[in-house]
Amino acid sequence: MRIGQYQLRNRLIAAPMAGITDRPFRTLCYEMGAGLTVSEMMSSNPQVWESDKSRLRMVHIDEPGIRTVQIAGSAPKEMADAARINVESGAQIIDINMGCPAKKVNRKLAGSALLQYPDVVKSILTEVVNAVDVPVTLKIRTGWAPEHRNCEEIAQLAEDCGIQALTIHGRTRACLFNGEAEYDSIRAVKQKVSIPVIANGDITDPLKARAVLDYTGADALMIGRAAQGRPWIFREIQHYLDTGELLPPLPLAEVKRLLCAHVRELHDFYGPAKGYRIARKHVSWYLQEHAPNDQFRRTFNAIEDASEQLEALEAYFENFA
């Protein structure tokens, strides 16, 4: 699949997730087979651009793959400025967030709240597309409520404004992440527009990935929550799409290697004073299958030292084996 001048190496994209898809996680997903990774959502508010959190969220020139940054906001000029600053910092694709259902984002008329206001959507898309010379993409939901699904209208508007790829999560804003994603709306959009359409929502395994591609006709898939603690899902899905065969479960030794390497990268990226806190949630996700009684996770979450975290993981896997 192509986005503007960029040819993706496959049809699998790691979704932007606030507080999760930092540089270490993006790099790992790319190594595990994602064709594209997208940064955490960055606010278009210029007052926060110089914060440590914002600087860490920006892409880095030496990152692998096509550097893609997602921005969020409601003011067209601010969004355009945010796009320009990120391109100057190395972004090769700008993604606009109009899919986040979080209340703190929607209260500022950003994220999926914008779907209620097509005129504002048009203004934002036009300003951002005209502000940068890199491809601009858009992520939306199917609408703002089940009785108000307007993704076909927004999709056509996006194509007319110069958006070069569209990701659709198969729920409305009101649905949050409840219930099951629906793919009829994504299929309808794919039949309506000529730009690439990326399906998102509840793609949890290779069989589901194949089914969603076949049903929607989507050009690619975006995978988010299913990659938490399981970044190798991209490799599993790609293998199945290529061969029709399922890979065997990842050996425990490989899980250990990937987890420990990921934790070390988090320690290095955030520094020892913060990295151990960020690592906790990732370790919890990795070990959901292996530590169902939560005892180790509770013990691990009480550790406040980076080196002790790694020692605890080594001991855990030795005992588990």
Curated annotation (Swiss-Prot):
- Please list the residues that make up the active site: 100 (proton donor)
Q: Which GO terms describe its molecular function?
A: flavin adenine dinucleotide binding; FMN binding; tRNA binding; tRNA dihydrouridine synthase activity
Q: Give the binding site residues for FMN.
A: 16-18, 70, 139, 200-202, 224-225
Q: List the catalytic activities from the record.
A: a 5,6-dihydrouridine in tRNA + NAD(+) = a uridine in tRNA + NADH + H(+); a 5,6-dihydrouridine in tRNA + NADP(+) = a uridine in tRNA + NADPH + H(+)
Record bears the keyword Flavoprotein: yes
- What cofactor is needed? FMN
Which keywords, in A-to-Z order, does the entry hold? Flavoprotein, FMN, NADP, Oxidoreductase, RNA-binding, tRNA processing, tRNA-binding
Top EC class for this record: oxidoreductase
The record's EC number reads 1.3.1.-
Q: Which InterPro entries match?
A: Aldolase_TIM, DUS-like_FMN-bd, DUS_fam, DusB, DusB-like, tRNA-dHydroUridine_Synthase_C, tRNA_hU_synthase_CS
NCBIfam families reported for this sequence: nifR3_yhdG
Sequence similarity? Belongs to the Dus family. DusB subfamily.
Q: What does this protein do?
A: Catalyzes the synthesis of 5,6-dihydrouridine (D), a modified base found in the D-loop of most tRNAs, via the reduction of the C5-C6 double bond in target uridines.
Which HAMAP family does the record match to this protein?
DusB_subfam
Protein name as catalogued: tRNA-dihydrouridine synthase B
Gene that codes for this? dusB
